[in-house]
């Protein structure tokens, strides 16, 4: 949130950080930055006593509030702190970059430091071409290890340290192919896992490994050349590999490790003690080296290395943690940086704030929906800083002098002093001066920010108006609880008071509750009427509700109405219906809707019908006024705006609360008791269900139960029983609700939708029903039973969780136990999923935080890399989408098409005489027949509609005629109804011509294209760039098709009967609504997408349910499935394929055959039992059951063959392996025993198959024995080998497909004769397990042809799809799987949010995981963003090691450095022409009587003396034209670069609210509501509107940003809330100090305006099609506007297309006196048209006319304009 300059700020000079360069300090840099060498460990006490050691004191001694630094002589907190350094006795390893040192040593020669690669090879540079930093180093190490070969040599060839120095061929040695190097053999390098970090070189011929310490490693790294370092990814100027080893250790100043004061005692920080230990160990090592005792040196070196390592990271696995005392561990530098409470996330990314309050919330239906009740104690503690001026001086003086609320707490004077009013004895004498800042109490009407944690989405933090109330809790309107996810059971919420006018303006224009009624997540309202008010609405609008005059008059007072409707009943006394009272609240809307689950019988008052704001019939229920898409809330928001929705909600709550207070509502015991008839029906349902369960059990016992695909008999039984019991509960619930009397309080609440369902009535009054755990009945948990009270193996409904009693009667003990088991599951799930979903949301936010809508209509990230050509593929705002629009066009057959769209023609092709006879005006019919070309135009219309039908049949996902509903920005159907009811006349014929309709619809479609932003639009509005034109046409395709079929000429004339006035109104409304729906440039759509996908995840469960019923495929659901997708997991828990089949295998019978062909089958899967039998003589087998089989086998063979077989068997092993196969499985899979035998022999030929040849026996048995007699070892070997052999014998199917299940789908076909489309059921196969590559190869069917249709076969394993089909197929599959994961829980999220997430994941051509392995490995994000996510120290170390530079363009990077993020209002910069302000005069002179009118703009404490602006008016007579000083305003978008400026001027209109005194212009006492004027309008693309606004005071230039593209100007807020008379003048310039802008390309330019420049108003002003570098701001103020126009006029910052010629600044009609003041665009270098494919390809320069060319306005013209506005 932006801060203001109302309170004193630091006087330190501030500069914006444009980039951050990371590097590792070299030894000389550390010494140069340090102020002293630290050689002795000084404690706090004795360091302060040192004399003459000022530098040592500033390193060791922390500053107090009264002391000054001995080095810079500054006091706290101005002293930044000063470093010292420790000269290490020996180099030591930096534990943070230890792994990098190991990688470097793998890349270079250990003798000479040369790179172990031939850099002349093309392959080396090709592999490293697109790699940087750590990835490059890893690749080099991998290539070096692959090439490196160790050669053997004699002992005479040993090199340094006894290592082999024979030449290394192919590397950098002297052998063949080598280019340079010493030729030494390269030992292997590995880490030594000892008591301290050491690199170990494993020599070739030595038994023991040699240990290299840091000093030797430093010598090797010192020999690495700069070129080799660059090839490895280093920047030698910033970090050479030698710098990875420490020789000098910097000592941070005390500001990093402040002392702790407690009770008058001071204690040094833990880091200070650790530094002292390092100094001591370093001195000890230096002494030991002088004594030259190796054991002592090794010990001291190890201790020094350990202390330095734990100083950096005390959580390393190398060492035991260093402890401060017996229990507390040292908090090292790493621990202070990383984690949730570290410096990055705890103090930079987020921090504690002042001016905030927190307490418990309670509900209050009597405050407005956008209000919050604030306790007096909070209102008196929190303050708002208000600057004193001539208008508010009296009011603020009263505040300052009061001692009771409302009062003030502090006064800030311009000289920096602060007066605390509570300390003054006599506050009645307090005086205020102009310029003082008074911190007054929060009062009614102040705007505050209200928040409930966790802040899961944008609507968890909204703006409210303050209502100060008694008691000590925050009061919240009940309708606001839904977006906050709040209730009143003890929830606490946070309140923040803005501290500047700019912050206040942002709250008012962007974050207030009415602005957020519709959520972009589901494109539906997130607030509505709830609970008591919903119940009251239902009862109030009941058909039996009649109200007397007293009540209706009271309601009128609640609603501030002064005229009552005519009563519905006059005699015997006047009575009004509740519907009439409810209609008093309704705005003028049309809303036909039918509540769900209700038969549409109008006589039963079940159909809700609202016409022109009158409720004609039907009760108001949740589906009508709740937070549902298409509800009354949604319709009012779209047609009348957010303020009208707030008024409607407030009115409903006041009226219904008053109604319930008078009529009452309660629930008693009688509402819970069912009558005897209901109990009898419920008992019948239970008896019926019990018999059904017994029937299923009997079928299972008899093994006649139909087994479901892929299920065992027991699983099928459980699925059937559970399904029957659940149906029993549903049936009982429906009967219970229907049997309850109409006045039952429970039934009233259920039907109103305020609380409860029919299931609740059933459970209270009748029975609770089946209790499930993990989607199944209560499992056995106590020795084959659920509880000890039941029999063993009891599968009945009572023992497995069925509760046959209700809550009123009371549950039995075992039923209560089962009920608690089911409830516990939900509690555990809620507790476990909280952390998982929170972490998931954080990862999504980090991955998408930089994605925003750019000014050219594209979606880009912080580096301006393209994510999407158009946001959501249509460029529309998710909050403006309306769903549920029926689209019947694809389902119309030829006859319907002709009846609906085609006109009647004669045989010769001319119009029939009957054409339009009953729906077309006779003059129109005559005109049509007069021109033969009209027939052709109407035929072309019909041909286009036919083509649209074919397109929609191909492109749309067709299910059912009633289910195909479109999500579009405009609901033309409702607009047509509005046009008919408001603009149309009751007539049977229309005066419109079909040709006129066709032309106007075509013109409308062309106009819609002009609404989209593009850099390549010519003066005629045509887009010359092919790519830009195609993306806009693609975005409009579906809407245009829907528009053409709705506004077909015949439908308009015959069905709607619209006249010309109504049709014109309809087209205008469609165009306006569509324009309002366009996305605002700068919108942080990435964060919105992350919130939209993350917040609903909290509603998911973490369990993986087994789908009971039709399918038995195990699927991963909920959060685990989301984590699999977003982490791009390659090991999915339940991977599966959907296999499409070619005809005729897509029929059910043949699909079953395909199922067996695809399912992977091994011999193990069909084997029931394995026996090992000693049976040496097969002629006299000991297995009696096998004798007939053996005889049959031998009888089939010839006698000689049989004898040879017997001899072969006898010669083999005497042990027989007997395999009993599952007969059913062999039959189902159509396995031939000969094929089984061949499969066994293919795997292992060492076995003899005795049986298995015959298929015509009931028992399928295979006897096999080894060919070799191994005696006593046979049995152990067989038991070991046979199970493995069975698993390896592949009989059939695709490896990896564990199960194959049938699945029916619908395929739509078109009858070419009639054009009718019908759906046919076809069968496909779902698999458990995936093998997509093998499925693409195919499976051969019985006819020898492939049965798998690979084109339509897919896998739910996204990485597998990516590896086989590429990134586009993976993107499509990821999108589908994400949507299915949410839809499984009924969560329908807007499509555009999925696309943003998926396109970001697939942006670079590979799947980027939304985790640390993806986000932190991406090259697109800077080090600051990555370290603020995870692995803080690791990322910073790598960034410093490789010299990375962060351009500070992302949200996180700017947040860390305190800059404005480049999204929203920060996406462009304001640049002020300082030279034009030199003639300005100070504020005191500007407001002095008799002076020229001047306005002073406060720009913060550092610029107040330097920047002033002035516009002086010197009128000569009444009609004279005032002139404007050369005060120029630059605006440019922070996108491109360069500056190509030319002045643009416009005349300033005379304002009649000013008066003349002595020839000078002065301001009269004008009320603040009159400080708004109609300005010249800029005609652009067919749009023109007033957009000038008074732009008065800018507070804090360093924090100033132009208000968002959807918000009114800061001047609006300031003039309304500060009431500064000196700012209610006629013209001003908006200066600012933000000149530092981001790097730009050479093709953008800076536009310069002089004086007052007027711009067009658009609902989303930034969405104009224009280059981002050309932005104007209005600075003109004039006469009064109405309240509506004031809410729209603003500091609009639209953009203008450079190729759109002839933009004229002119006044609203009929005021043409300013039409000559034009801003003309011309192309630099001529007027040539451009058709390049790139953006921003040409510079453009504006030309402007001088102010003298504009004619002065007249008083009459102003009067005309006022009349028009009124």
UniProtKB/Swiss-Prot annotation:
Positions of transmembrane segments: none
Family matches, as SUPFAM superfamilies: beta and beta-prime subunits of DNA dependent RNA-polymerase
Catalytic class of the enzyme: transferase
EC number: 2.7.7.6
Binding site for Mg(2+) 1: 487, 489, 491
Alphabetized InterPro entries for the sequence: DNA-dir_RpoC_beta_prime, RNA_pol_asu, RNA_pol_N, RNA_pol_Rpb1_1, RNA_pol_Rpb1_3, RNA_pol_Rpb1_3_sf, RNA_pol_Rpb1_4, RNA_pol_Rpb1_5
Catalysed conversion reaction: RNA(n) + a ribonucleoside 5'-triphosphate = RNA(n+1) + diphosphate
Binding site for Zn(2+): 69, 72, 79, 82
Annotated keywords: DNA-binding, DNA-directed RNA polymerase, Magnesium, Metal-binding, Nucleotidyltransferase, Nucleus, Transcription, Transferase, Zinc
Gene3D superfamilies the record matches: 1.10.132.30, 1.10.150.390, 2.40.40.20, 3.30.1360.140, 6.10.250.2940, 6.20.50.80, RNA polymerase ii, RNA polymerase II, clamp domain
Compositional bias annotation for Basic and acidic residues: 1706-1716
Assembly: Component of the RNA polymerase II (Pol II) complex consisting of 12 subunits.
Note: The binding of ribonucleoside triphosphate to the RNA polymerase II transcribing complex probably involves a two-step mechanism. The initial binding seems to occur at the entry (E) site and involves a magnesium ion temporarily coordinated by three conserved aspartate residues of the two largest RNA Pol II subunits. The ribonucleoside triphosphate is transferred by a rotation to the nucleotide addition (A) site for pairing with the template DNA. The catalytic A site involves three conserved aspartate residues of the RNA Pol II largest subunit which permanently coordinate a second magnesium ion.
Protein name: DNA-directed RNA polymerase II subunit RPB1-B
Organism this protein belongs to: Trypanosoma brucei brucei
